[in-house]
Amino acid sequence: MTDNEVKHNVTKHGQPKALYMLFMVEMWERFNYYGMRALLSLFMISTVIGFTKATSSKIYGMFTALVYLTPVLGGYLADRYIGKRHSITIGAILMAMGQFTLASYELINPILALGTGLTLIIIGNGFFKPNISTIVGELYEPNDPRRDGGFTIFYMGINVGAFFAPFICGFLGEPTDPMNVLEAYKWKYGFMAAGTGMLIGLVWYLVSQNKYLGHIGLHPVTKNDQDEDPEEKAKAEAAKKPLTDEEWDKIKAIFTFVFFAIFFFAFFEQAGTSLNFFAKEATNLTPVLPIIGQITLKASYFQAVNPIFVVLFAPLFAKLWLKMGTKDPSIPSKFGWGLFLQGIGFAAVAIGAALYQANGPVSAIWLILVYLFCTMGELCLSPVGLSMVTKLAPLKFMSLFKGVWLTASFFGNLLAGWLASS
């Protein structure tokens, strides 16, 4: 199948069939990542590893920071040497190996299992993450009106995987009674479930890629490809010209937005550490519900709240910006609203923490509130980031400043680990 045939091999909704194949692969990869993420900080403070919450938070922050850094190298290697599709295969294999290594703590030293497993996941994510989204982009011509809708469908896969993972991996892996010896060592089943999810996605990808993708993403980008690419030609021409005062002002604006985004992501990533600890230690996990009666929750289940809110609210926010038309808030306004809404969320959980100090475990509503407002803040700020870069960055430095935007997540996660540890 030629590249052109791939782009025109569509469903009744007009989107390329290859999009839905990639949707499934991404869904299982995110199931793999978010299933592990829901358990990681709790696993590190368990009797298996025995870290303090401070140490656990620092390691978690470093891990999630590096997850955002390695895709820069992975994308470069795929473009120049390996090819995007081979990189996806390598990344999926490494991430699955990482999950099963995490689950091997009874066979090898638990600290060694933890360090090796996380390292494999970090490297695997670097090969996988940038290349699958790039292939989605290659399913469309640059000005194809289906492109935005296609990416919306693709990113829905992220949230579907992220929603189900905490329930399945948490149910299998998080002990209900840590004092029970058999229960205390069931973490491995959660990590094995996450790794199995990645293997399912990998098998689906290997079986389906030739049928749906043709030659798209199969080979590295050659010098001739770059010479024939109109965008690369435009960058080459722009590179010969010095930056104007207006471009320097836009660069300063980018760094200003990145600075504030660092703090947003630092608090947003408390979900995996301090909010996870709050769920485990300060939240009533056996509430009595009307009609249903008493239910038993696990701390890891709350990691599913953000993705379900994203699924519910993302279409509403998209319609809101569209409906506002020319009154659509500016980029600084959206950043401001994002930080403000996040602040409301953490004010709510602070009230919950005060009630816990006074009366013991509190209602889960306080955690749900912080996730609700943080999700609304995320929808104001996070999608605007790359869009802001493409609007403001000089053409010849476009790739560089896309990388600069990713550093907001990198430094934000480092700061998140430090905040949670203190």
Residue locations for each model-derived region?
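Intracellular loop-helix junctions on the cytosolic face of multi-pass helical membrane proteins
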Residues: 1-21, 141-145, 169-294, 317, ...
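Hydrophobic core of transmembrane alpha-helices in multi-pass small-molecule transporters
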Residues: 27, 98, 110-131, 358-380
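A gly/Pro-rich, aromatic-decorated transmembrane alpha-helix motif that marks the paired
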Residues: 38, 72-73, 160-176, 350-351, ...
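Cytoplasmic membrane-interface "Motif A"-like loop-to-helix N-cap segments
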Residues: 80-93, 322-340
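Central cavity-lining transmembrane alpha-helices of secondary-active solute carriers
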Residues: 61-79, 163-165, 304-317, 407, ...
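Transmembrane alpha-helices of Major Facilitator/SLC transporters
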Residues: 69, 207, 288-327, 338-346
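C-terminal ends and interior cores of transmembrane alpha-helices
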Residues: 90-110, 337-359
